[in-house]
Amino acid sequence: MFGQGRLGQAMALLLFLGMTAALARGCLQCDPNFAEKFSFYRHHVNLKSWWVGDIPVSGMLLSDWIQNTMKELHLAIPAEITRKKLYQVAEAVYQRMDQLYQGKMYFPGYFPNELRAIFREQVRLIQNAIIESRIDCQRHCGIYQYETISCSNCTDSHVICFGYYCKSSAQWESAVQGLLKYINTWHKQDEKMRTTPAFLSQNIKCLEPQHLVNLTLEKVSECLTQH
């Protein structure tokens, strides 16, 4: 397919987990059932272990769940997740937590260790959900947008990408024309107001800001097919 080489490179970039923690609160708190569920978990934590030392440790794990989630995500892309995937992750977490809370008191150390295991699994699910959506987006042909929730403030957001999965030269040409039109419109926007899509990447030299003014259809197509 046209542009598949570039798609592969983009997928590899998306799978890279950067080590700079995003300035956000988390993702799971954006689920409408989160407050009720975690309020229950916190208020019943003192009934889950025979050892009194487990109670403050478990309580801290639950209280810091959201902020610790963002510290562990380490994503090199913005933490924006689709509602469908968010609800799927939340349901998986609640299911494991509910099962844990259905048991009677546990022997010392077991309960906080199980909480840590659920936490790690939640982080992995969120990482995969965000990255998979980005990869799926790039499997389209041309400019594509999908709706998300921003994990930083739980507001509606969207992700815009450029897909390289074009099945013919005509589709590819149309995709490049759409990209050029988008770039021209983007370039005219107020720098303080606009956001920079991931595909306007420094890894693609011709799409760096200083080159956008002089872009032509031929230059864009040539540049993209070289990556």
Curated annotation (Swiss-Prot):
Question: Source species, please?
Answer: Mus musculus (Mouse)
Signal peptide boundaries:
1-24
Q: Where in the cell is it found?
A: Secreted
A Pfam family it matches: IZUMO
Q: Does the keyword Disulfide bond apply?
A: no
List all annotated glycosylation positions. Answer: N153, N214
Q: Which PANTHER family match?
A: IZUMO SPERM-EGG FUSION PROTEIN 4
InterPro entries attached to this UniProt entry: IZUMO (IPR029389), Izumo_fusion (IPR052868)
Q: What keywords tag this UniProt record? A: Glycoprotein, Secreted, Signal
Q: What is this protein called?
A: Izumo sperm-egg fusion protein 4
GO CC terms, sorted: extracellular region
What more the UniProt record tells us is: Izumo is the name of a Japanese shrine to marriage.
Q: Which family does it belong to?
A: Belongs to the Izumo family.
